[in-house]
């Protein structure tokens, strides 16, 4: 409220409107071979340049704990499928990169893991990472021999790895 030289009062009102700045995130997926680790980094986008999302040691990316639905400081969580652990998720909090290490016998798609990052205002955004593990199936070649009773018969069966990136090991510790 103000008064002019003549003593006439005047009133004005100021009403600011605050618009929300909401960051966004993109879900990510990967596909890899059985027994091979997979990595992916969810992409976070600022809602406005005045509130950037800069993932760092001071503003770390975090997993959302699947049991509590809350952010956790844990950098390793079990990867689950139908209530069973099928591997492990790890996160680099300073970059947001998630690594999935499947159990050697797991094939399929585990439950996705959710990652959260916050912008400069502290507003969170979340994205999921969903890896898929494709099977690697080695093959064996049958062999047969014929001989008279009492005579020694020999033949070597042949095993072929399902993929060169997942070698088949046959030795004294892991015989055929």
Where in the sequence are the language-model features?
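Acidic, turn/loop-rich segments in luminal/extracellular domains of secretory-pathway
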Residues: 1-14, 71-129
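A surface/secretory-pathway sequence property marking extracellular, secreted
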Residues: 55-86, 172-176
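Extracellular interdomain linkers/hinges and stalk-like, low-complexity segments
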Residues: 4-56, 112, 120-174
